[in-house]
């Protein structure tokens, strides 16, 4: 990875930690990492995620489970939109401790029970006082849940955590409160890093759960004195060039592609089942036809979402490319400033050398002769002047 480039054995993009690479170089090193990471978000961090309703699963196909509403009418898959906050990493520790700070400054500590439900404890407000629950900004209590369903739709007053995907889903009322107050943060744990994963200390405020060392994310500009009272920044940090969400955006595109492939495989499975003697009955054939109709609609929806994912990805990649270009332009600007300073110092050095040469490399005998001649002229001028001033006005009266 270009982020791990080094110069003279020192990593370029890691601030003062020049002895540490930006990413984990091996699975062995990655396995040693265990961090509690804190991420703060604003309204711009909230994205829309498309999920499928009434989607068919592999279990539905095997069990010939046709999707129906409460009135017994067949329903077909559709697309819904949920509000998502994407964490910096996927596959965060599901059995770890989460801390969610809502837009009002209330903090909830959340762990996962053995049955998959959420255990919410220690809820305090911004003043440190214990309260019953988070609220949606209108006084309504907010529930917190865990989910493994990639198509999960939270309730209006619900926050859903998907640790596998590294996502926090916001219900409509929670989203509105977060958007209005422009504040939300999540603290989570991650211990299953892999080779190539980014070291979280380079991007986030976090705590090393192995050593207990706390890392506070801040600017680490390395400056050199290049002239009198003039300093120049000589490094570029990773977050100034590489966006950690580039990989997450690629994951979204891959998920959209894989979803389309999975649905096509499901369609092939149903078509194959229609030809089997086991499902030759009229009732089974009807169910398979109904499922096939739903799956074909689901495939069309998936293809549409895949196209939109690629279109969105192109825009995101252009933004990341622009960020890198801006970083390169900044480095180029600093190089020009350094070259200008170097040119000025070179000129000053030449001038001082010339002055030094004029003073130190002169012919001493010639200087003495010139000095003596100048002294004689000076003394003669003084003598002539003294004779002139000896006469007064009275010498000319008479």
Model-flagged regions — what are they?
Residues 50, 54, 58, 72, ...:
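Non-transmembrane, interaction-prone segments in cytosolic or luminal domains
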Residues 8, 17, 30-33, 55, ...:
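A sequence-composition feature that detects small, non-aromatic residues
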Residues 2-155, 192-209:
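Extended beta-strand solenoid/passenger and fiber regions
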Residues 49-50, 112, 187-192, 204, ...:
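Generic detector of bulky aromatic hydrophobic side chains
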Residues 2-18, 153-323, 327-330, 337, ...:
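Polar, low-complexity export/assembly segments characteristic of proteins
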């Amino acid at each position: 990875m270009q982020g791990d480039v080094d110069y003279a054995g020192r990593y370029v993009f890691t601030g003062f930690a020049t002895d540490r690479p930006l990413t984990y170089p091996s699975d062995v090193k990655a396995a040693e990492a265990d961090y509690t990471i804190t991420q703060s978000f604003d309204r711009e961090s909230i994205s829309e995620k498309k999920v499928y309703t009434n989607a068919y699963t592999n279990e539905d196909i095997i069990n010939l489970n046709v999707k129906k509403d409460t009135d017994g009418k067949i329903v077909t898959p559709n697309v819904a939109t949920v509000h998502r906050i994407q964490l910096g990493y996927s596959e965060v520790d599901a059995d770890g401790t989460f801390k969610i700070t809502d837009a009002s400054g209330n903090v909830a500590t959340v762990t996962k029970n053995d049955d998959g439900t959420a255990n919410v404890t220690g809820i305090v407000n911004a003043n440190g006082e214990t309260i019953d629950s988070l609220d949606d900004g209108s006084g309504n209590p907010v529930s917190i849940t865990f989910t493994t369903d990639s198509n999960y739709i939270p309730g209006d007053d619900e926050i859903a955590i998907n640790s596998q995907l590294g996502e926090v889903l916001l219900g409509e009322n929670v989203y509105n409160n977060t958007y209005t107050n422009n504040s939300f943060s999540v603290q989570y744990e991650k211990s299953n890093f892999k080779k190539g994963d980014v070291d979280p200390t380079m991007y986030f405020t976090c705590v090393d759960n192995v050593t207990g060392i706390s890392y506070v994310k801040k600017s680490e500009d390395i400056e050199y004195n290049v002239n009198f009272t003039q300093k120049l920044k000589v490094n570029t940090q990773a977050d100034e060039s590489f966006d950690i969400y580039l990989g997450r955006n690629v994951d979204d595109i891959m998920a959209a592609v894989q979803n389309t492939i999975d649905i096509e495989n499901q369609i092939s499975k149903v078509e194959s089942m229609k030809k089997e003697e086991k499902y030759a009955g009229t009732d089974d054939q009807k169910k398979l036809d109904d499922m096939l109709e739903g799956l074909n609609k689901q495939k069309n929806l998936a293809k549409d979402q895949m196209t939109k994912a690629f279109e969105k990805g192109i825009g995101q990649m252009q933004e990341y490319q622009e960020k890198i270009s801006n970083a390169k332009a900044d480095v180029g600007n600093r190089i020009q400033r350094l070259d200008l300073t170097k040119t000025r110092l070179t000129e000053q050095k030449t001038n001082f050398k010339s002055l030094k040469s004029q003073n130190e490399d002169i012919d001493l005998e010639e200087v003495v002769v010139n000095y003596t001649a100048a002294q004689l002229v000076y003394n003669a001028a003084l003598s002539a002047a003294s004779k002139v001033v000896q006469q007064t006005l009275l010498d000319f009266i008479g």
